[in-house]
């Protein structure tokens, strides 16, 4: 028993030391996040546990003790941050019923929106009811009109509308937004995919009500029959899983998670968005599709009164991409990041392709989840602790003179570059890809070594160098290659080939991907390490397919469960080691 006490004291001391040394370790987290040029990122506040959303007060007071923004935590706490950056607990537990503390229940708080005029704070959530069934719900915290304090005066639950609907983790009730006296809320499809096509259920829909939870009579499916039903609340339906909502004037834009693809869309009153369980139906009405899926979460746009970013960003949407649940390390397809693109509000379409503002480059599991613009920058929340063990709210600012050390332009992840340059469109790499080009798995080094170090190849290069019409860059790349021998020549050749495929063969069919030398070097080193292991890959794939039949679809709850299980397992191992060391 005393070993357990020692362990608890040690963990507590470690936590205290970690908190006290925040300033000394202030640069560790920067290794986790790569940022675009002309931007800087700093820590605003810390000390959260699985934060899931941030929301700012529109017109905060000027005193140091006046509330500035709220941070919602997945497991039910709601915190408020004052101007002096003190973090207060606004509500200890937003859930209507006690949840089983003996197990990890994958339910929690999802959406957060504020109405300062009336002094309201709304939180959406999923919870286990008395029968152990997942249900959706909303709570409204009441403050004095015009002023939201650091603690509420009262609260009101709204549960009846959802009491007969079965929710589900990751497909639960989600974000909320307020326009004048109207409250919009997104509800995921739950467990049964075709629920999205039913007006008798709020599942898979956008619902609209007044600030007292009453349906609005101008809702498209409202029936004046003295009965309160789901159809009375529905604004649009046929959606799968909306994770982000943003009102621009009276127009409602959303980000939505699919199975294999995600989408950005505008929600129109009364529209059926056709989701019936397939990605084809999901994609039927989309303004922009992200393929493969990157886990789109919250989105925001700079308001007219927020001027910290330049004018060129005034019609730009910023979107958080959390990535595939269960993943760790940098995303291979641009996920675990913040994405932005320009939007033409007259033509109702994107006016630029998506680009990255921020990308995760850490080695651990991470889920970027929420952003919101304020008068002094873009605030950003990742759900899991960074490599220094802390959970922060970050602030991103536009600063052309910044000295932020970790920049996006210096990409170091070869898998990201494989995706960026579309290498798998033609080539098989690590068992995946197309078959139009040579397989890059099968002992590439050995295959190239013999050809590139042969007398025939050297004679071929001599003939090419005699040409007067050849591009100068080709001559430079050939010179770089031929000054090396053996494996060094193979590496140099591959770096040159990735930059300019025609540098030593003008008949080559491969098009240039415009890779720079730094990216080409990272790709070359990665490709030369690939091994031929097709039989093992096939065997492993069969095993994965067999196992996957008996496992649930991986979602956020599995990451959190694995995260907690890892901590518990580490503690058990440490106790065992202490016990045997004592013996």
Predicted regions and their residues:
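Sequence/structural segment immediately N-terminal to covalent heme-attachment motifs in c-type
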Residues: 45, 409-429
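C-terminal capping alpha-helices of c-type cytochrome domains
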Residues: 377-379, 384, 398-402, 490-503, ...
């Amino acid at each position: 028993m005393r070993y357990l006490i020692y362990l608890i004291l040690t963990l507590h001391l470690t936590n205290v030391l970690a908190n006290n040394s925040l300033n000394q370790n202030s640069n560790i987290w920067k290794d986790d996040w790569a940022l675009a040029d002309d931007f800087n990122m700093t820590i605003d506040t810390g000390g959260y546990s699985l934060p899931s959303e941030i929301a700012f007060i529109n017109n905060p007071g000027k005193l140091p003790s006046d509330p500035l923004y709220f941070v919602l935590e997945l497991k039910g706490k709601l915190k408020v941050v004052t101007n002096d950056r003190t973090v207060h607990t606004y509500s200890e537990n937003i859930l209507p019923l006690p949840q089983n503390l003996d197990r990890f229940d994958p339910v929690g708080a999802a959406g957060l929106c504020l109405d300062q005029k009336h002094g309201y704070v709304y939180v959406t959530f999923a919870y286990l009811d008395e029968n152990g069934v997942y249900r959706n719900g909303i709570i409204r915290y009441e403050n004095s009109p015009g002023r939201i304090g650091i603690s509420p005066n009262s609260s009101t639950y709204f549960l009846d509308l959802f009491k007969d609907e079965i929710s589900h983790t990751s497909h639960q009730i989600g974000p909320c937004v307020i326009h004048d006296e109207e409250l919009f809320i997104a509800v995921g499809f739950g467990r049964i995919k075709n629920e999205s096509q039913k007006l008798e259920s709020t599942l898979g829909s956008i619902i609209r009500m007044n600030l007292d939870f009453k349906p609005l009579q101008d809702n498209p499916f409202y029936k004046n029959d003295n009965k309160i039903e789901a159809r009375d609340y529905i604004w649009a339906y046929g959606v799968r899983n909306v994770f982000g909502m943003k009102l621009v004037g009276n127009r409602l834009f959303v980000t939505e998670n699919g199975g294999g693809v995600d989408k950005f869309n505008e929600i129109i009153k009364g529209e059926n968005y056709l989701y019936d369980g397939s990605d084809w139906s999901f994609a039927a009405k989309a303004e922009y599709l992200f393929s493969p899926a990157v886990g789109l979460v919250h989105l925001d746009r700079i308001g007219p009164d927020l001027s910290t970013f330049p004018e060129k960003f005034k019609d730009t949407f910023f979107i958080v991409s959390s990535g595939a649940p269960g993943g760790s390390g940098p995303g291979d397809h641009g996920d675990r990041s913040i994405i932005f693109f320009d939007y033409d509000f007259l033509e109702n379409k994107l006016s630029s392709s998506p680009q990255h503002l921020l990308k995760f480059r850490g080695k651990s599991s991470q889920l970027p989840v929420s952003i919101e613009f304020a008068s002094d920058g873009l605030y950003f929340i990742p759900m899991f602790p960074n490599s220094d063990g802390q959970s922060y709210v970050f602030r991103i600012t536009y600063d052309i003179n910044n000295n932020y050390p970790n920049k996006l332009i210096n990409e170091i992840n070869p898998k990201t570059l494989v995706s960026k340059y579309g290498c798998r469109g033609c080539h098989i790499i690590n068992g995946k890809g197309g078959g139009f080009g040579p397989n890059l798995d099968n002992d590439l080094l050995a295959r190239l070594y013999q050809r590139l170090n042969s007398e025939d190849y050297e004679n071929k290069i001599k003939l090419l160098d005699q040409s007067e019409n050849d591009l100068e860059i080709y001559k430079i790349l050939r010179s770089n290659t031929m000054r090396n021998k053996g494996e060094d020549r193979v590496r140099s050749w591959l770096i040159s080939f990735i930059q300019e495929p025609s540098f030593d063969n003008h008949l080559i069919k491969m098009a240039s991907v415009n890779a720079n030398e730094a990216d080409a070097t990272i790709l070359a080193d990665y490709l030369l390490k690939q091994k031929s292991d097709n039989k093992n890959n096939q065997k492993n794939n069969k095993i994965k397919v067999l196992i996957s039949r008996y496992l649930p679809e991986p979602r956020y709850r599995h990451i959190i469960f694995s995260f907690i299980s890892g901590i518990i397992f580490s503690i058990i191992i440490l106790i065992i080691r202490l016990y045997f060391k004592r013996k």
